[in-house]
């Protein structure tokens, strides 16, 4: 086992133990709001292997919104890939996103070996299709909870710049 993997394994286990009260509390709050506490999304990992990336649920299901709003959301997501003030984000979801608490379940991804503590952000197949030939560089790394994108301004970094990172 490589030293980075040993570090990731030990550090993620220790961090999970340290933040377990927060993990449990957030899971309970989300469950009480009627949503499943954990959101899973398919992401591309090392060597192009797909894995379930875990996050705390921070949005309501789009089908719970009026059809006009659903259509507007889908148009903007298709055009831009994201929304600045997404109406699906819950009040509690906005707070856990702002504080990055929504990403704490990714410590389990690190524990399971799908992710590392430090590496490029895990991306979806939709995003990978935009990478072009650069996707081959991405596939050579284990995705991480934190990396250069987060410390370089996070959401303020333009998408093309993020791909280059």
Identify what each model region corresponds to.
Residues 1-63:
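A hydrophobic, helix-centered structural microdomain
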Residues 3-7, 53, 85-89, 104, ...:
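Alpha-helical membrane-protein architecture signal
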Residues 31, 36, 104-165:
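Hydrophobic structural segments characteristic of membrane proteins
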Residues 39-88, 146-164:
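Short, glycine-rich, amphipathic interfacial segments at transmembrane boundaries or analogous
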Residues 96-106:
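Short acidic-aromatic low-complexity motifs
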